[in-house]
């Protein structure tokens, strides 16, 4: 089966909060923080790219691509590491995004997610206008029963 999807998602801000205190905010100003990963790492043929775009006084990260289920593929993603950021008390991840009326997923990895296919996941559906999505950390679902809750 071959399914080709072109999409664009624009994320204006991303922040981790512990109650009302912001622990970390990404302003999307460094080209070195984010990396693109596609299903090509496992033989897929999906293609994607991202860039930074100024929207008003803020910067956003824009992810675009073609996703194909050919060769057992079907994903593109952007990823960044959070070094020297203590997230132990974080309650929520807030994403401000817009896109093409599709469902998107946030995957969090921890020191327990050793294998590449392990993660904690939450989803949200973007529309044509920017919207804040507050994703409680406690609602992220683990990708396998071997991961702690």
Feature annotation, model-predicted:
Residues 2, 16-149:
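Beta-rich carbohydrate-recognition modules and glycan-binding surfaces
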Residues 4-14:
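Sec-dependent N-terminal signal peptides
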């Amino acid at each position: 089966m071959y399914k080709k999807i072109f999409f664009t998602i624009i994320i204006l801000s991303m922040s981790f909060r512990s109650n009302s205190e912001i622990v970390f905010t990404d302003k999307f100003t460094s080209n070195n923080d984010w990396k693109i990963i596609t299903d090509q790492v496992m033989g897929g043929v999906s293609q994607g790219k991202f860039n930074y775009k100024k929207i008003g006084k803020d910067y956003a990260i824009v992810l675009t691509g073609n996703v194909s289920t050919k060769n057992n593929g079907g994903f593109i993603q952007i990823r960044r590491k959070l070094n020297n950021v203590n997230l132990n008390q974080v309650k929520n991840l807030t994403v401000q995004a817009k896109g093409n009326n599709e469902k998107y997923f946030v995957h969090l990895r921890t020191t327990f997610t050793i294998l590449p296919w392990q993660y904690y996941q939450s989803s949200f559906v973007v529309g044509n206008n920017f919207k804040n999505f507050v994703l409680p950390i406690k609602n992220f679902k683990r990708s396998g029963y071997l991961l702690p809750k």
